[in-house]
Amino acid sequence: MQEDYEIRWHGRGGQGAITAAKILAQAAYLEGYQGVTAAPSFGAERRGAPVSASTRISPETVMVVSQVENPNVVVVLDHTLLKFEEVTSGLVKGGWLIVNTKRHPKELNLGGDFNIATADATGVCSSLGLVVAGLTLVNTAILGAFIRATEAVSMASMEKAIMERFSKSKVDINLAAIAQTYEITEIEKLK
């Protein structure tokens, strides 16, 4: 049964958080969700500066396009952003915090009433050569961790969304990043 998901993305300019938000919305639509929105948060961001985006997916029509304030999923593309309180602000009890890091969820010592999933998306993307202008693009890889943790969309729907989003020459490498990150994702569920 499909559930409502309100997802907030945190990354740095150039990592692809906004693109990831849009790809997830497309995959959810292909999965059969009736309501999908993806909204970037714009400010004075520049390459390397903190950025955020929001995705809403629902079996019903979504009429809201504002930023997500009380997410049930927070995705962090750069683990160094965890030092900022607003990253986990509003994360609902029992929700998911998904972090791109080499560390196991228990090692993050975050406390909180939420589940944690971690994966070294940076390592996966570096090994595959998903690097542009010196920045490792972890946006597609972290989608593998999202799928593993939430099961909100299937790998098949994500593959279709990737094929619609990227040119043929970029599809295979991005699908490999998603699949590899899915496999290495470590999960610590709230007890």
Regions found by a protein language model. Give the residues of each.
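Active-site cofactor/cluster-binding pocket
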Residues: 1-191
